[in-house]
Amino acid sequence: MKAFLILEDGTVFEGTSIGSTREVISEIVFNTSMTGYLEVLTDPSYAGQAVTMTYPLIGNYGVCYKDMESQKAWPDGYIVRELSRMASNFRNEDPIQKFLLDNDIPGICGIDTRALTKILREKGTMNGMITTNENYNLDEVLPKIKEYSVKGVVRKVTCSEKYVLPGKGPKVALMDFGAKKNIARSLNNRGCEVTVYPAYTKAEEILATNPDGIMLSNGPGDPKECVEIIEEIKKLYNSNVPIFAICLGHQLMALATGADTHRLKYGHRGANHPVKDLKTGKCYISSQNHGYVVDESTLDSKVAVTAFENVNDKTNEGLEYVGKNIFTVQFHPEACAGPQDTAYLFDRFMDMMKKED
């Protein structure tokens, strides 16, 4: 069946339908990872977006459900050059086409994803429609495509109630703004008892449990939309509990302490982004998935200082908070998918909690 990707600038790509045949309008982004497509599909940070995979062949090792980073797939749509018809992997359980169908994700394959990525790179992230309707009217659909905006996605992806992953070590409160499983797993593997809280939990409820540390997770959308959450993070900041924040959590902590954020032209999404530790001068390859960054020009040096920067575009990749046991990073030290170069940051968080004891 034919499928069409219509961008808000009027560009149309014709290809073949994959997954669900329902029509969808979404924000079109691209990911440069060569592997890890299942982790990408199950990353809650993609809620409200349709993701383009720049690597040309997707699905060649099938689907292994143990590799999922959440309970379901989150992107609105999926765009690939070629979808593998056969999977070669002893861990394979299902073809990716079945996974897309089971999760009701519409997609398109057989288009020039390099050309699409160049458009997004040059013009910036834009909205688009995936449809199987061959009789679409461009004049009618373009206004609808342009009207779309990503809203309310943190409330959509967060857990409905708190739950506990038992452990005999430090007690960590993890605020779930769209947390990938490997954040809790990385803490759990280090012996932590992890209590996962819904995104809109009051700070008083969390602090009443006397946690040894607080983790602010990744998540989707514009951080400035999370007004209620930012107010609670202000209270967490004023406590003496060690805090480690990743991605959206990093942005929310910055907003809670008076800094600002802005949108990137086309975002950082992939498993090959170099970041530099400004204290040691060392560079690491990191996994990233964000469309917003902290604006360094708005930082108060008495509150926070830059700890990491992006080697490619010099944007902020991490902060250390002055006089506080708080550090935050824009990238994903938990990876999945991606390199484990910065997993040591979880050990640093462990050391912070032990010192507090």
Q: Where do the language-model regions lie?
A:
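Short acidic/histidine-rich motifs immediately flanking catalytic phosphotransfer sites
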Residues: A208-L216
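Beta-strand-turn-beta hairpins that frame and shape the catalytic cleft
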Residues: G167-V172, T280-C283, Y321-I326
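Active-site glycine-centered loops adjacent to acidic/histidine catalytic or metal-binding residues
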Residues: D112, C247, H290, H332
